[in-house]
């Protein structure tokens, strides 16, 4: 890895491939730029988020990390749409693209040299096919399906694959037996990267925490405090309005009575 890569781009796809099997990469999903800035400052090496125009500036603000934009499943209904969106995301600064579409779509993106991260295991938009929110790959048939799907993505040209809620032993074999850079989300610690969502790490919400996630902080408590402070501030404003506080010279502009009377006389003559 070249020094300028670390300073300007963070880990490139080239670097990630070279690091496979050598050390574990720390990867987080973010929802906000504030989360991304904190992740970068903490030493997180790989950051991802869904590709939306409101987030198109994130890579420029987060230079020095490997930045991945993700295509939301269902937003692109054809290979052409996925290709166009991926190219836009790369132009906006992404170094890799998460694509949960089929190997045939991934193959087209890969032929255009778009570095693709595929997805196997528990895929939230497709859970009806695997029986809901549960581990995928514990039985022989399911493990075989996960393995064969991973191999199809490898053949299609994906450079990496997210393994979500797949048995750790199965994820380990996929890591050892394929060229894919593997990313574990609830799939043990033997993959090439360990992945969690920032909302879970930070405790942004006081709601369901997936079994595979770990909450390190409870920021929702601080959010509640801030929310209550906002309510109190608005209530104080309402009270001040009701009590005509804004007539005070501190909050309004004064005018000489002579000038006012002159204006009134002018208006009355019209």
Language-model-derived ranges and their functions:
Residues 1-270:
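Alpha/beta enzyme core
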């Amino acid at each position: 890895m070249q020094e300028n890569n670390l300073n300007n781009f963070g880990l490139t796809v080239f670097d990630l491939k070279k690091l496979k099997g050598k050390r574990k990469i720390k990867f987080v999903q973010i929802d906000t730029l504030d989360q991304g800035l904190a992740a970068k400052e903490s030493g997180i090496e790989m950051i991802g988020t869904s590709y939306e125009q409101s987030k198109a500036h994130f890579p420029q603000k987060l230079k020095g990390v490997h930045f991945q934009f993700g295509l939301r499943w269902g937003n692109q209904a054809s290979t052409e749409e996925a290709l166009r969106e991926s190219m836009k995301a790369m132009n906006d600064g992404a170094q890799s693209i998460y694509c949960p579409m089929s190997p045939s779509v991934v193959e087209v993106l890969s032929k255009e040299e778009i570095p693709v991260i595929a997805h196997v295991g528990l895929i939230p938009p497709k859970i009806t096919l695997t029986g809901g929110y549960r581990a995928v790959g514990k039985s022989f048939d399911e493990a075989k399906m996960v393995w064969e799907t991973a191999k199809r993505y490898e053949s299609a040209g994906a450079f990496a694959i997210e393994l979500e809620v797949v048995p750790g032993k199965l994820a380990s074999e996929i890591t050892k037996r394929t060229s894919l850079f593997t990313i574990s989300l609830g799939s043990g610690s033997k993959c090439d990267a360990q992945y969690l969502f920032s909302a879970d790490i930070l405790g942004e919400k006081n709601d369901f925490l997936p079994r595979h996630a770990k909450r390190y902080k409870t920021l929702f408590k601080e959010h509640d405090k801030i929310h209550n402070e906002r309510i109190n501030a608005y209530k104080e404003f309402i009270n001040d309005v009701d009590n005509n506080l804004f007539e005070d010279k501190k909050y309004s502009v004064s005018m000489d009575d002579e000038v006012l009377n002159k204006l009134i006389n002018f208006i009355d003559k019209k």
